[in-house]
Regions:
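S-adenosyl-L-methionine
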Residues: 50-57, 61, 83-95, 188-233, ...
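Conserved S-adenosyl-L-methionine
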Residues: 218-279
Length: 279
């Protein structure tokens, strides 16, 4: 009887151990699934961001992006690209002094005909960026050394392709376009097409502090970039005897006071709640 009781006790302990192992395995599996979903979400929410700047000043903007903690993915004439998340969109618009604007790259491909342009734009996942009530239009198209050279035709084809893609994705034939604005900018260079969403809206040289401008003013982004190329520091005096509207002194004063250039203005992407979540 005692031997039977001891045996039953051992069996019970084994059963409990098996149950504990199953529970542990379930928890581990759920953690793995959670971490996987988290990793996928973080990956899916990362974007290729393109920062246009003045020609010859790419190194200045590149250093600014590095200082914000992001890795550069590409440097071209008048453009610097880096990878970032929704927070990077906000930080770049607010803190970059030499950038003209911040663009979110939707796609990049080769196109030598309008059919190729249409099909490639249509293949882009626009539903991941623009909601069904979003107001979208091609704000600007530029073409350099490309077979497709008419900006107005490029704008028209890209808009049509976007509509066709979104009609299929949202299963609707008409878009109210009464929601947030999603301006599109298209660039062609040697038949390579880059399609982007403009997260900035007005050019970033519009800081929001100037009520009036003088004749032939120096842009704030150019002034800030030139200052950053000099050995000037905040503890030094800056003298500009031909200051005009005072762009150099104002930009230097903002640097010395550590005032972000985009603090006093708004950005288009502020209303993109599908991309930039509200906390």
């Amino acid at each position: 009887m005692a031997r039977h009781t001891a045996k039953s006790h051992k069996i019970r302990k084994v059963e409990i151990l098996v149950i504990q192992m199953k529970i542990y395995a379930t928890i581990l599996d759920n953690n793995v699934k959670y971490n996987y979903r988290k990793a996928v979400t973080q990956y899916m929410n990362r974007f290729e961001l393109v920062v246009p700047c003045h020609f010859g000043l790419e190194a200045v903007v590149k250093r600014e992006i590095y200082d914000l903690g992001y890795e550069i993915t590409r440097v071209e004439d008048g453009r610097v690209s880096f990878e970032g998340d929704a927070e990077a969109i906000c930080r770049a618009n607010i803190f970059l002094r030499g950038a003209e604007r911040v663009l979110l790259q939707v796609g990049r491909f080769k196109a030598a005909t309008f059919d190729e342009l249409f099909e490639n734009v249509k293949a882009l996942p626009w539903e991941n960026y623009i909601p069904k009530d979003g107001r979208f239009w091609v704000k600007k198209a530029s073409s350099i050394k490309s077979k497709l050279f008419s900006p107005s035709d490029i704008q028209s084809i890209v808009k049509k392709a976007m509509v066709e893609r979104m009609k299929r994705s949202y299963h609707i034939d008409w878009f109210p376009e009464d929601g947030a604005q999603y301006p599109v900018r298209v660039f062609l260079y040697k038949d390579e097409v880059m399609v982007t969403l403009d997260t900035s809206g007005d050019s970033l040289h519009k800081r929001g502090y100037r009520l009036a401008t003088s004749k032939a003013p120096l842009t704030e982004t150019l002034a800030a970039s030139l200052i950053m190329l000099t050995p000037w520091h905040a503890d030094r005096i800056l003298v500009d005897p031909f200051c005009g509207s005072g762009t150099f002194p104002i930009e230097a004063a903002m640097m010395a006071a550590n005032i972000a250039p985009g603090m006093n203005r708004e950005f288009t992407a502020e209303s993109w709640t599908n991309i930039i979540p509200r906390k």
